[in-house]
Design a protein with these regions (language model features):
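Glycine-rich beta-strand-turn "strand-cap" elements at beta-sheet edges
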Residues: 2, 40-48, 76-95
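Short, well-ordered beta-strand segments in beta-rich or mixed alpha/beta enzyme
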Residues: 2-8, 39-66
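N-terminal first-folded block
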Residues: 3-30
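Residues at secondary-structure transition points
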Residues: 13, 20, 47, 65-72
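An amphipathic, aromatic/His-enriched active-site/gating alpha helix that lines ligand/cofactor pockets
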Residues: 24, 28-37, 55-89
Length: 95
């Protein structure tokens, strides 16, 4: 299993727009083969920090996800709403 944590530091006046556009991404992604879970989470202490937490069956499923139309159209747009570059970490399950 592969887990991805993609943290975005969103401009204060763009948080709602980010969430609305992310909704399209989540709705399409959870239907993909190999997607175990995929959601957007908001930091309880700083509402401008929005984080996608994803679980994939394997690396192949994750790589296929990156070729989808919704990924290629939504992700670049979401990055324009960030006030600074985010953090992207990928993990493999050990135990």
């Amino acid at each position: 299993m592969i887990k991805v944590v993609s943290k975005h530091f969103v401009k204060e006046d763009k948080v709602e727009e980010f969430i609305e556009n992310a909704k399209r991404m989540v709705e399409a992604t959870v239907k993909e083969e190999g997607c175990i879970s995929y959601g957007l989470f908001q930091d309880e202490n700083d509402p401008k920090i929005l984080t996608f937490i994803e679980e994939w069956e394997d690396k192949e499923a994750l790589e296929k996800h990156k070729t989808t139309e919704h990924f290629k159209s939504v992700v670049p747009f979401l990055k324009t709403l960030d006030e600074r570059p985010g953090d992207l970490n990928t993990y493999k399950k050990l135990i």
